[in-house]
Amino acid sequence: MPAPAATQTATLNKFIDGWKGWTPDGFLASWSDDCAQVTLPFSSGVPPRTRAITEKLFPKLMSILTNFQLTVHNVIHEPAESKAVIYAITTADSPFGPYKNEHACFVWFDESGESVNRIEEMFDGVFMKGFLPKLEAYIKGQEEA
């Protein structure tokens, strides 16, 4: 039986607020310990990320993308299915140019409804095709410095 809609909604709002706040602790606050984050499309071949991997990745990413802004355009919540989808645009500054990405972010709630236990996120493929190589080169340069 799904968790009450009000509980799921509070968790969904906590997830969005954490994303908007753009701090590792805030963003991860709604994630369950076993939460998995999957990059879409599946054909991108990016392996799922565990919470433990994300806890290491986010501080690095969040220090690179500054002046982060989240604009949510649509949220659809299906309490009976314990899931929701968020369509949003994010912008930020980076050392190698502006960041502007579109996201379709699908989230699933655990049995209690108090945590997100799965995330599948579709990014703007056109933007990411140009941005990811710059991001990877920047991170590599920082690690070598």
From Swiss-Prot:
Q: In which pathway does it act?
A: Secondary metabolite biosynthesis
In biotech or industrial settings, the protein's use is given as: Secalonic acids show unprecedented anticancer activities against various human cancer cells and might be interesting for further derivatization, targeting diseases such as cancer.
GO MF terms here are: monooxygenase activity
Q: Which UniProt keywords apply?
A: Monooxygenase, Oxidoreductase
* Source organism superkingdom: Eukaryota
Question: What does the record give as EC number?
Answer: 1.-.-.-
What EC class does the entry list?
Answer: oxidoreductase
Q: Which family does it belong to?
A: Belongs to the avfA family.
Role played? Monooxygenase; part of the gene cluster that mediates the biosynthesis of the tetrahydroxanthone dimer secalonic acid D. The pathway begins with the synthesis of atrochrysone thioester by the polyketide synthase AacuL. The atrochrysone carboxyl ACP thioesterase AacuM then breaks the thioester bond and releases the atrochrysone carboxylic acid from AacuL. Atrochrysone carboxylic acid is decarboxylated by the decarboxylase AacuI, and oxidized by the anthrone oxygenase AacuG to yield emodin. Emodin is then reduced to emodin hydroquinone by a yet unidentified oxidoreductase.
Put simply, this protein is called: Monooxygenase AacuP
Query: What's the source species for this entry?
Result: Aspergillus aculeatus (strain ATCC 16872 / CBS 172.66 / WB 5094)
